[in-house]
A protein has these predicted regions:
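Active-site helix of classical SDR
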Residues: 43, 79
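Active-site-adjacent segment of SDR/Rossmann-fold oxidoreductases
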Residues: 68, 89-100
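Conserved NAD(P)H cofactor-binding loop of Rossmann-fold oxidoreductase domains
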Residues: 11-16
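Residue(s) in the substrate-gating loop at a strand-loop-helix junction
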Residues: 63
Length: 182
């Protein structure tokens, strides 16, 4: 077709706030297919041409959920941890070859994600999509392999490094329990 992708942005994804067994396997299949499979396939298809030209890049939208287990978002958080780890691995694998990889990890962003996720968003702070996109592009241009948008999000990503994962999981479960239907 003669098309060339200079920068691939894998931004599509969805999640659900629910008790694990309250969602269908079909929902989880769709989530994993979009959040992981589509991202891998698009990256696999676009990167060879970037390597051939000696330049290009991939921005994969992960999440602040990538950094710790998230009760009531177990499958979503696991899928975003996959995105983060894949992206950082590819950044290391292709370093110095002209193709740059960035995992963009936003927190709550004012999109339709939360309504699709069935989340109770009362009192939650949100960034605008424009703020997240600008921060992501700046991180990409500056050669970062991971960018966490927002100071509070960055600090929360450090919790699993200073506290045990069990403690972090208990804290997160307490924070999010009232955000899902019983």
């Amino acid at each position: 077709m003669g098309l060339r992708v200079d920068v691939l942005v894998n931004n599509a994804g969805f999640g659900k706030w629910a008790h694990f067994l309250n969602e269908s396997l079909d929902t989880y299949d769709q989530m994993l297919s979009l959040n992981m499979d589509a991202l891998v396939k698009l990256t696999y298809l676009c990167v060879p041409d970037m390597l051939a030209y000696g330049k290009g890049g991939v921005i994969n939208v992960a999440s602040t959920a990538s950094f710790q287990p998230i009760p009531y978002q177990a499958v979503y958080a696991a899928s975003k941890a996959f995105v983060l780890n894949l992206t950082e691995a590819l950044a290391g694998e292709y370093r110095g070859r002209g193709v740059h990889f960035l995992a963009l990890c936003p927190g709550n962003t004012a999109t339709n994600f939360m309504s699709t996720a069935n989340a109770n968003t009362t009192g939650m702070p949100f960034s605008t999509p424009e703020e997240v996109a600008e921060a992501g592009l700046n991180a990409f241009v500056n050669g970062k392999s991971c960018h966490i948008h927002g100071r509070a999000n960055y600090l929360s990503s450090l919790l699993p490094r200073v506290l045990s994962r069990a403690v972090v999981t208990k804290i997160v479960a307490g924070m999010f329990k009232n955000r899902v239907a019983p």
